[in-house]
């Protein structure tokens, strides 16, 4: 649970349906932060407190919470239970040992240096996987980006709140990336896993901006590990670069989308030199290249479930032949974000959106985690 400072908790009157601040000096607005594998359905009901400066909240997925017979309940839905992500993790001491091991093996690696911070200080599970040689391994690639997303977790330019996973300062070489990926895939496959590594992590910019280096990495990894899943998380801004990466050996991609509508897309991403049409083209490129295509839908109650957004999202998912849809709660100060987006019609509710997607697209897998291509079927 988290306190929302400088804000008032709101409540709706049962009799009049009016909304007003809760009376009482000690009535504080709070929100829940959900564990992985759960999707936020409602925002906490609150507003700015008059007369106080509106400090921007840190980057969390603030979720409505309530008291029900003395128990805290939250407005959330289970979105995934993929065992490799939901099971028990190795101990902290084991993690520290593995980090120390890889630092000694690759003392000058920028990738190892970045992942060490992510694993130990930010508790990034994908970074930790890379040291344990299990599951999806992280390959942070780019220090630059061609967007200035309102909810960017690696670089905040104007919100006044710190990034939750500060961006890597210097981009690694192709040799660095190959060395880290190879040790991860060797260990994973020796343990009987299909092996998976991913470009594009929360602590970096846009990996497609490093096309030349990634082409070299993908080519070498595909030569060494014929059955591995080589995945990229991307904003989909450069479809031709993505096509060349598929030709080099990348066989899976996850493209993040806040909205398929250009006005809302541009308001959130603040892109430099690309549009939603380029993102759509990247999706089509993935399908044409026979790569696994996943859409990472950044959801925000009252926006994602606006009636026109619901219809457009379902239509685009159908047209693009998406294999998996990942429901992702957008981590951002709710009031701060809404002040920067176009006004939308009242939302129908995320549960109704999810049900419409299930009914309209029965073959579409839905979840929260990307699956490796070999040895793991989508739900």
Question: Where in this protein do the model-derived segments appear?
Answer:
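Auxiliary Fe-S-binding modules of radical SAM enzymes
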Residues: 1-106, 311-379
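Short, charged low-complexity linear segments at domain edges
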Residues: 111-135
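Core AdoMet radical
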Residues: 136, 140, 156-180, 184-217, ...
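Short cysteine clusters
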Residues: 145, 149-152, 199
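Active-site-proximal loop/turn and secondary-structure-junction residues that shape catalytic pockets
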Residues: 203, 234-238, 259-261, 299-301, ...
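Alpha-helix-loop-beta-strand connector modules within alpha/beta enzyme cores
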Residues: 211-227, 276-293, 344-368
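Structural motif
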Residues: 248, 289, 319-320
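Conserved strand-turn element in the central/C-terminal portion of the radical SAM core barrel
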Residues: 270-272, 282-309
């Amino acid at each position: 649970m988290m306190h929302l400072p400088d804000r008032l908790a709101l409540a709706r009157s049962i009799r009049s349906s009016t909304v007003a601040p809760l009376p009482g000096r000690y009535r504080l607005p709070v929100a829940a932060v959900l564990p992985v594998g759960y999707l936020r359905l409602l925002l906490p009901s609150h507003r700015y407190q008059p007369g106080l400066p509106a400090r921007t909240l840190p980057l969390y997925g603030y979720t409505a919470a309530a008291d029900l017979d003395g128990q805290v309940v939250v407005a959330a839905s289970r979105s995934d239970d993929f065992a490799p992500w939901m099971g028990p993790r190795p101990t902290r001491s084991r993690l520290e040992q593995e980090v120390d091991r890889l630092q000694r093996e690759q003392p000058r690696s920028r990738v190892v240096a970045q992942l060490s911070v992510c694993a130990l200080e930010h508790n990034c599970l994908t970074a930790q996987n890379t040291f344990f040689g299990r599951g999806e391994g992280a390959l942070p690639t780019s220090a630059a980006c061609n967007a200035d997303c309102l909810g960017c977790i690696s670089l905040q330019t104007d919100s006044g709140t710190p990034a939750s996973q500060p961006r890597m300062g210097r981009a690694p070489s192709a040799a660095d990336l190959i060395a880290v990926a190879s040790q991860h895939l060797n260990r994973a496959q020796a343990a009987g896993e299909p092996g998976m590594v991913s470009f594009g992590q929360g602590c970096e910019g846009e990996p497609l901006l490093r096309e030349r280096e990634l082409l070299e990495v993908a080519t070498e990894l595909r030569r060494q590990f014929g059955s591995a899943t080589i995945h990229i998380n991307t904003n989909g801004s450069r479809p031709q670069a993505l096509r060349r990466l598929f030709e080099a050996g990348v066989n899976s991609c996850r493209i993040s989308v806040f909205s398929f509508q250009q006005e809302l897309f541009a308001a959130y991403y603040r892109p430099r030199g690309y549009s939603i049409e380029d993102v759509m083209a990247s999706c089509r490129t993935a399908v044409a290249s026979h790569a696994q295509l996943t859409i990472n839908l950044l959801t925000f109650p009252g926006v994602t479930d606006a009636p026109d957004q619901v219809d457009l999202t379902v239509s685009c998912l159908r047209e693009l032949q998406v294999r998996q849809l990942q429901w992702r709660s957008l981590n951002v100060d709710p009031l701060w974000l809404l002040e920067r987006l176009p006004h939308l019609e009242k939302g129908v509710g995320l549960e109704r959106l999810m049900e419409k997607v299930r009914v309209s697209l029965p073959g579409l897998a839905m979840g929260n985690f990307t699956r490796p291509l070999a040895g793991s079927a989508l739900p």
